[in-house]
C-alpha cells in the first residue's frame, strides 16, 4: 500500500487527509478540529454515465452518525475521486469543529 498526506488550513480549522492506495482503489481519511472522531463514511463506485456510456460517472453510499454533518463532504469527495480515478473510493470523515465561525 502507498500512502500520501495532505493538509489545509490553520489552527482549529486545520484539516488533514491521508490517502492510501489499496490496489487500484483508494481510501481517504479526512480529519480535523478539536476532537477527531468518526462522523461519516462514503463509498463511491464507478459506473457508465447515464447520458454517455463512454464517460465514467459514479454512485455513492453514505453512512452518517447521528448528529454529524460530514456526510456531504464524504459523499462529494468520494464521487469526485471516483470520476477522476475510475476506481472504487472510500472516504472516512473525522472532523469536529464546534461552532465554526468561518
Describe the predicted segments one by one:
Residues 41-86:
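Short, internal acidic amphipathic alpha-helical interface segments
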Residues 1-36, 40:
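N-terminal, charge-rich interaction modules
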Residues 25-27, 88, 100:
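A residue-level signal for beta-strand positions that form part of recognition/binding surfaces
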Residues 88-95:
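Glycine- and acidic-rich phosphate- and metal-coordinating loops
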Residues 95-101:
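Residue-level detector of conserved catalytic or cofactor/ligand-binding positions
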Residues 32, 43, 95:
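A short beta-strand motif that forms part of the nucleic acid-binding face
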Residues 1-7, 69, 73, 91:
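A contiguous, well-structured "functional interface" segment within a domain
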Amino acid at each position: 500500500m502507498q500512502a500520501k498526506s495532505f493538509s489545509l488550513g490553520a489552527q482549529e480549522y486545520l484539516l488533514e487527509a491521508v490517502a492510501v492506495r489499496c490496489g487500484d482503489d483508494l481510501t481517504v481519511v479526512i480529519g480535523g478540529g478539536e476532537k477527531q472522531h468518526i462522523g461519516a463514511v462514503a463509498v463511491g463506485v464507478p459506473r457508465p454515465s447515464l447520458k454517455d456510456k463512454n464517460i465514467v460517472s459514479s454512485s455513492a453510499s453514505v453512512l452518517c452518525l447521528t448528529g454529524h454533518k460530514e456526510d456531504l463532504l464524504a459523499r462529494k469527495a468520494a464521487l469526485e475521486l471516483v470520476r477522476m480515478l475510475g476506481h472504487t473510493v472510500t472516504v472516512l470523515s473525522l472532523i469536529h469543529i464546534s461552532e465554526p465561525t468561518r
